[in-house]
Regions:
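Sec-exported extracytoplasmic/periplasmic mature domains
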Residues: 101-112, 134-138, 146, 175-183, ...
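N-terminal Lys/Arg-rich, disordered targeting/topogenic segments
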Residues: 1-16, 24
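Active-site microenvironments of hydrolase-like enzyme catalytic domains
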Residues: 73-86, 120-178, 194-220
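Active-site-adjacent mobile loop/cap segments within catalytic or ligand-binding domains
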Residues: 136, 141-144, 192-265
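Active-site histidine-acidic residue metal-binding/catalytic motifs
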Residues: 49-130
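Stable alpha-helical elements in mature extracytoplasmic
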Residues: 92-95, 99, 103, 126-132, ...
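Sec-dependent signal peptide cleavage junction
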Residues: 32-50, 55, 254
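Hydrophobic membrane-insertion alpha-helices, especially the h-region
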Residues: 18-35
């Protein structure tokens, strides 16, 4: 047997030792390999439940909502330096905005998407109001106002002079439900403008969808003001229900309105 001297490396393993080392390494690889192959597989059972949810998955879950049934553009009349009708400290622009926000609330509770032409006491051009509704591709346009006349009282709803059946139905549904809540006088559904039956209010003329303009009583009539203050939530619900009733009648559930108003001459 050869002896090892100074400067000569001693073998680390004998033949038997190398065989044992290789055998141990083989079993180690067998133990690790199944786990290494699972990195790209979906976890199941308890493993799946213990997996952390990624930020992307959380965001997708949070934003996954039921699609809106349809879209309504609510237009609170006047605003900013245009107060509309004024009686004492009471401004038409304030009453209109309060009502629009309430109607919005009740419509959204019924999964209806709502767009407001203004959300605060701000002046908005009539052309911008119409543009807001058209760009939103709204199914309906509802403008909210108040009247002024020392001899007048009651609630009325207007459509365009060249109104469509759907616009008229929308006006009728809203007017009927408000009257049921309680008004001093039912002034009915009217077509055109106060000045001319052959003309139309700008916002109704320039919007491409069925639309109405509501006059919520006379601001200079004490009884009308009392009724509005007492029943404002009920009026808002009546308007919202009238809108939904009309949409369901003409389009059913899940359909997008394809009806556009006929352009005015």
């Amino acid at each position: 047997m050869k002896r090892t001297g100074k400067g000569e490396k001693k073998p680390a393993f004998s033949r038997g030792g190398r065989a044992v080392a290789l055998l141990v390494a083989f079993f180690v690889v067998l133990a690790i390999l199944p786990q290494a192959r699972q990195w790209d597989q979906e976890p199941t059972g308890e493993a799946a439940e213990s997996q952390p949810v990624s930020a992307v998955q959380t965001e997708l879950a949070d934003t996954k909502q039921e699609a809106a049934r349809f879209t309504v553009c609510l237009d609170p009349g006047h605003g900013g330096n245009d107060s509309g009708c004024v009686y004492g400290k009471r401004h038409e622009s304030d009453d209109a905005l309060t009502m629009a926000k309430l109607v919005k609330k009740y419509l959204e509770q019924e999964n209806v998407q709502v767009v407001l032409t203004r959300t605060k006491d701000k002046y908005v051009e009539l052309s911008e109001r119409a543009q807001c509704a058209n760009q939103a591709n709204a199914d309906y346009f509802v403008s909210i106002h108040r009247n002024l006349n020392p001899l007048g009282c009651g609630v009325e709803t207007w459509t365009r002079a060249d109104y469509s059946k759907e616009s008229n139905a929308l006006a009728e549904a809203i007017q009927k439900r408000m009257v049921k809540v309680g008004v001093q006088q039912n002034r009915g559904v009217k077509h055109g403008t106060q000045e001319s039956a052959s003309s139309s209010y700008y916002v109704l003329r320039k919007t491409k969808m069925p639309g109405v303009l509501i006059e919520l009583g006379f601001i200079d009539n004490q009884k009308d003001n009392q009724l509005l203050d007492k029943h404002k939530k009920a009026y808002a619900k009546a308007i919202a229900k009238g809108i939904i009733q009309t949409y369901e009648k003409y389009h059913g559930e899940g359909e997008k309105s394809a009806t556009n108003e006929t352009k005015s001459k």
